[in-house]
Amino acid sequence: MHADEDFSPAAERVGMSSPLSHCQYAPSVAAMTAVRRMVFVPFSAEQMYELVNDVVAYPNFLPWCAGSEILSQDAARMRARLRLKKGPLDASFTTDNRLETGRRIILSLVDGPFSRLHGQWQFEPADGGSMVRLELEFEFSGKLLGKVFTAAFKPIADSLVEAFRARAYVIYGR
């Protein structure tokens, strides 16, 4: 499966359940933009987890990332800030990331131009490599600004899985 394909029921058969589907808070889906991507890579789940969790390296390979910093971190959590710059979008946001080493990173919005942002990365071992899955739901604050920012941010979100797949080949070879 390629990074630009949406999930199908087959994606669920690989055993990658989503904790987002069990959230008690159910935001209005009509206003939310959702991104769901999955790709197989010939690298371990642990290697892919390390790439995604290396927030400080993002400006080195994500062209829209104008800056990143880790505000706090321990074994189970990381608070990080990213600065995005693409077209009319020039904004910083902070997330609290719950870390399940080698398996999952769950993102929750702390502050930024979003009214809502939550999601997760999942890394599942598979024969000859791993499956990398991203689920992201977001909504920008303000109706007019929200439309402009969504138009700029959705392509960024859509390209994330492919960007990390490409980065894995640069870092790990093959």
Predicted feature descriptions by range:
Residues 59-60, 67-75, 83-131, 137-139, ...:
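Hydrophobic-ligand binding "helix-grip"
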Residues 140-174:
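A conserved amphipathic terminal alpha-helix motif
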